[in-house]
């Protein structure tokens, strides 16, 4: 498995763990243990994304709300909301990853697992977050 494939899988695992937590309320350690018992590797990058997105959830939801025209994070389906949380966290706290990669991975995850228009919403919100980030750093 290449580094990119490993990071793609780690992002998807983080989204799934956050989604499961949102829906079930189970603690992350229990969800991680269940994943590992099922033979899924929960590596360092998955844990970093999961921890960061869960600890900064309110802040990330505020960023999402600010970038989403006519939407709030609370109104979104749990899967879309958690794809955005992971991606926004990575955009803001993992500058070593190119913005285009973060956005493309989030859009691909939405295309694979969400409804037919979810990827457009996610692309638009992440594009707005990236533009805002560029404006504040220049």
Segments predicted by a language model, with ranges:
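N-terminal interaction/assembly modules
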Residues: 1-138
